[in-house]
């Protein structure tokens, strides 16, 4: 029994950039956390409360993103363009709808959900701001997660990783160093999430459609 070097190479080619993308998100969140810390105990606790619900919504998106990687890879291998297109459409639709519904429930009934963790007015204030600014737009993450998953299914894992590094790390660092440095405002700090999602999603979607067009010429 010997190592299949070709298979290992392909696994690393897809897996390493995907891992890098996850690491970049963690680094970006660490930087944002430093900004959150400047708002004291209320800001820190309020953000932590909302994150519990944000993760529920995001993991729905992530589940569909992982699914489209597998099915796109299978059908790309079979050179079935129509199925690849259908996988993208269904994955995006299911991701946006499921995340949108859950996020809406959390936001509409935020008083109840926040109340499960705290009754402190300061914590509630910051938690509801993050609910309204971040969780309301959580379904936007589908734009780069689903299209990025399809790109990985095509064997193009580096493209979404590089675009995500720029959209989710570089942009957020610039925002923290400029806007948040000029204006010490919690709402402006939280606004970087949907802004970066729109930018990253747009870039990865464009990359997906251009790549798909080239692959099935």
Residue ranges and their predicted role:
Residues 1-16, 72-137, 179-217:
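Short alpha-helical transmembrane segments in multi-pass integral membrane proteins
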Residues 30-34, 56, 104, 146-150, ...:
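Alpha-helical transmembrane segments of multipass membrane proteins
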Residues 23-50, 56, 74, 112-121, ...:
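Helix-terminus/linker motif at the lipid-water interface of multi-pass membrane proteins
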């Amino acid at each position: 029994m010997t190592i299949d070097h070709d298979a290992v190479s392909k696994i690393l080619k897809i897996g390493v950039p995907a891992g890098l993308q996850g690491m970049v998100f963690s680094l970006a969140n660490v930087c944002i956390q430093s900004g959150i810390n400047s708002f004291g105990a209320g800001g820190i606790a309020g953000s932590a409360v909302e994150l519990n619900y944000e993760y529920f919504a995001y993991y729905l998106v992530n589940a569909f993103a992982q699914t489209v990687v597998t099915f796109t890879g299978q059908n790309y291998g079979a050179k079935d363009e129509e199925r690849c297109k259908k996988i993208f459409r269904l994955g995006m639709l299911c991701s946006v709808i499921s995340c949108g519904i859950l996020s809406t429930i959390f936001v509409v009934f935020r008083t109840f959900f926040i109340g499960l963790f705290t009754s402190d007015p300061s914590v509630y204030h910051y938690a509801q701001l993050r609910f309204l600014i971040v969780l309301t737009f959580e379904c936007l993450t589908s734009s780069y997660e689903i299209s990025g998953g399809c790109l990985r299914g095509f064997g193009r894992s580096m493209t979404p990783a590089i675009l995500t590094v720029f959209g989710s790390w570089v942009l957020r660092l610039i925002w923290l160093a400029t806007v948040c440095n000029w204006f010490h405002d919690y709402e402006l700090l939280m606004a970087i999430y949907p802004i970066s999602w729109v930018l990253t999603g747009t870039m990865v979607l464009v990359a997906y459609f251009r790549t798909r067009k080239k692959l099935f010429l």
